[in-house]
Amino acid sequence: MQKMLPFLIGLVLCANAAVFVSGDAPFHEENNEGALDELAGRQAWEWQQLHDPATGKIPDFVRSQELAFLRTLQKNDPSLKSRGDVWQSRGPWNVGGRTRALAIDVRDENHILTGGVSGGIWQTRDGGTTWKKVSLPDAHPGCVSITQDPRPGKQNMWYALSGEIYGTSASGGGAFYLGDGAFLSLDNGDSWTPIASTASGTPNQFTSNFQGGWRIVASPVDTVATCLYMATYGAIWRSTDTGKSWAMVLGNNSNSAYFSDVAVRPNGVVYATLSSTNASVKGFFRSADGVNFTDITPSFLRSWERMVIGLHPTRDEAFFIGEVPSDTSGGVVTTNYEGTKEYVALLRYQYVSGNGTGNGGVWENRSSNLPTDAASSFDRYNSQGGYNLMVRVQPGTDYVVTGGTNLYISTDGFTSKNNTTQIGGYSLGSTIGSWGVYMNHHPDQHDLLFSASNPMQAWSVSDGGIRKTKALKPGNTVWEDISYGYITSQFYSVTINKNKPFDAWLLGGLQDNGNYIVRSRQLKAGWKMTINGDGAYNYIAPNREFYIISTQLGNTRKAILDEQGNVLSRRRIDPDGVDKSVYNFINPLAVDPNGEDILYMPIGPRLGRLKGIKSLPVNGDMNKLKDRWEFTDSVVVSSNVAAEITTLAVSANSHTIYVGTNNRDVFRINNAHEGKMTMTPLSTFRLPSGGFVNSITIDPDDDNKVFVCYSNYNVN
């Protein structure tokens, strides 16, 4: 007799913080799924989990509602505060998260402020030995740019900008992770408050240009009023009253440029860019007063996407590097490690006279001298569609530093191909299946700043946090990772050893940064990379005999690790003949606790079963597994609509499986370990269509009792 399924319907609140990795495993394995192809998949997966099924949107003001609800719980149940629950941070201490924002105090280079796109604003006053998060827990967690007012007497004033709208950790490149405007610190970075004129109050719905930020900078020359510039979605803005009000000096509110950038010279001259695709106001611009801008766009460049600016420290000269749409745009072709083409451009502009147009400015296209034709595809310049871009000119040497996935330095400003050296990112000569990272550095460059007192010294920020060098120069640049304690990692999953109570080992699936393992409860214990990619669901076998480790889109391995967490061997075990598009972006898996020898995994709308995982040889074979997988005969049909399996749970003693879908429904499979697996639907008619089943927990003593968690907002 079918019994009514008892439900616990809850709201899952997902907090995001970015992360990556030190290269300390004996070998690294690159997950060869195409990064650009996966962006839409990640976006759809995140949206499915959170949207209100009734409206198809994430509700306005939902973060403030969450905090208010939490305060109500604490008020109504004082035991939540008094019962003595103690939470211990487990890190990762040694893994810095994705960082776009970096600023160095002009008075003290040991005072550094930096920001993660979803990790908040952090500060160090001892050069990176210790870090402290200075943004409030209930403040918007995103930070894409930080600037200090450089004028004497005003240097305790700092500004930050939120809102990454390309390549976000929450939803994939090209998707909005909306900000909520700019923030101000009046106490030298110790505390931050929103700038009201830029705050929309609705960071989950796009209502203002200020929600998509690219850069905020302060002019060093205005003696009377603070002069700020912001590059946002669609516009360049200027404020002369510490951000109380803003004037749009470039751009518009319709047919807007998606990408923009702004930079200010020491004499107050302003350079700006607005991307060209579908934009009515677009181009490269220069302004002597920050109000009146002249279009100086070079005639040889026909179209462009994101373009970032690097100014010469003493001359009125600017470099621009960025992504262009095609081979006819004016740039050059390059390829990523999979051979996928993209097009990039590197331009130099020298101001001569007048308003900078015509003979008043000289343009050079130096794109052909970028390192786009190296023998190893990992060594080539790759901006990943404009996700990682930076260019800087080193004071005193005129060396030009550019960044994509890797970091490069050219001693002749890229006037030739002959004088360029890779000084960061991936290890030189990396290939698919055998790759590493440049010693103490990290791929995916977002910015680099030079020391004002010693231009050979520099700080670099990337998807792996913050690095410092005392000698930025061609050749073997020595980097120091100063991200220790800069805890900004984002986890998709955490796996414990369920067969050994209180075991300290944790295996985590990290956003964009693979699967890390740690062996100690100590906060400062080092986490080690196992398999790279977007870390997903994992499993630890009894006595840690083997591990099941997965990355995005169902890419699954069986691995053997030593007692230090190093990967000794591995093999791929996801089924052959299944296209990656069928999987959830972060695809669940479960091992039957009855014998620990059967792996279950959703394959889109079907459930797969792999028997005999204990005896499956770990032989280094990285081809998908043939023949051994079995699947449910019937496709899951939920509420008369084809649905995907989003989660599953296996009972502790009866081989019973429950699966949930992205369209509210839950199914039960009896005796799933043998014969055909038949799904029996359980009643969920009281729930709205579209509810995302995030997790299921089975009562260990009675498999007729389960808890089901829906992660969507407003499902109750």
What are the language-model segments listed below?
Residues 1-10:
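N-terminal Sec-pathway targeting helices
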Residues 9-20:
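Hydrophobic membrane-insertion alpha-helices, especially the h-region
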Residues 23-716:
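Beta-propeller blade termini and top-face loops
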